């Protein structure tokens, strides 16, 4: 899910 990319940090 690309939406979870914001939680990669």
Swiss-Prot record:
The modification Phenylalanine amide is found at residue 9. GO terms for cellular component: extracellular region. Its main location: secreted. Keywords: Amidation, Neuropeptide, Secreted. It comes from the Eukaryota. It is found in: Secreted. GO terms for biological process: neuropeptide signaling pathway. The keyword Protease does not apply. Belongs to the FARP (FMRFamide related peptide) family. This is CalliFMRFamide-4. It comes from Calliphora vomitoria.
């Amino acid at each position: 899910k690309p939406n979870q990319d914001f939680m990669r940090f």
